[in-house]
Design a protein with these regions (language model features):
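C-terminal substrate-binding/active-site "lid" region of AdoMet-derived donor-dependent transferases
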Residues: 155-218
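The AdoMet/dcAdoMet-binding core of the Class I SAM-like
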Residues: 58, 62-170, 187, 209-211
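Conserved SAM-binding loop and adjacent beta-strand
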Residues: 46-60
Length: 218
């Protein structure tokens, strides 16, 4: 795990400080900064991880604080640096057996480099496309995080009824899905909400700026 100097940690409370830039297999440049003593992963168009301050998981997990002690297994689709797991570990002292899936090997490598996520030797990083992984997965999970973005867009398959049904099938009884999503229109939001409500027994919508976070109970 990369260590950040104390001087940079202190300076990061004033403005973001660049730690490195890395170009992935697809030619996209990813920037790693430390900001407010949190590691932040970004591209020119989006923030993909921001330590314990990553709203797509800090807000839903706070909402689920009474459920968190029961979370023994976690699947993350769209890992980024692994902020979802980082928040579980650092804010809630919870270390579930975890599978972190991302299509981008560069992001998985950065996750291992900057977040010390595997202290309990129960975390696996897998480079795979999310729908392919789900199609071939035979495990069950207490918690699934769905955070798939291409810049500021969510792939169409991630909002499809077929894919959401498959995720439902990967949850244990009383398992929970956290779905971070942006919509292009009110109509699209209504369609996706109807799909979720037709699959899961309880759906709660949380919001921060443009992002919608759905907490869906099996």
């Amino acid at each position: 795990m990369s260590k950040v100097s104390l001087i940079k940690k202190i300076g990061s409370y004033v403005y973001p400080l660049l730690l490195e830039e890395r170009t992935d297999y697809f030619g996209k440049v990813h920037r790693i900064d430390i900001y407010r003593n949190q590691i932040m992963l970004s591209t020119p168009s989006a923030i993909y991880s921001f330590g314990k301050s990553y709203y797509p998981f800090s807000i839903p997990l706070k909402h689920l604080k009474n459920d968190i002690p029961k979370i023994k297994s976690f699947l993350m689709l769209g890992t980024g640096l692994g902020s979802g797991l980082h928040i579980l570990q650092q804010q809630f002292n919870t270390y579930p057996k975890t599978t972190l899936v991302d299509l981008n090997q560069t992001l998985l490598d950065l996750s291992k480099q900057y977040f010390d996520l595997n202290t309990h030797h129960n975390v696996e990083w897998i480079c795979d496309e999310a729908s392919h992984f789900v199609d071939n997965c035979h495990e069950k999970y207490n918690l699934i995080g769905l955070d798939l973005f291409i810049d500021m867009s969510v792939p169409l398959f991630a909002k499809s009824e077929q894919f959401l049904l498959k995720l439902h099938g990967l949850l244990n009884q009383n398992g929970i899905l956290i779905f971070n999503v942006l919509f292009s229109s009110i109509n699209e939001m209504k369609i996706v909400e109807e799909r979720l409500e037709g699959i899961y027994k309880e759906v709660t919508r949380l919001k921060h700026d443009r992002n919608n976070f759905y907490v869906c109970r099996r």
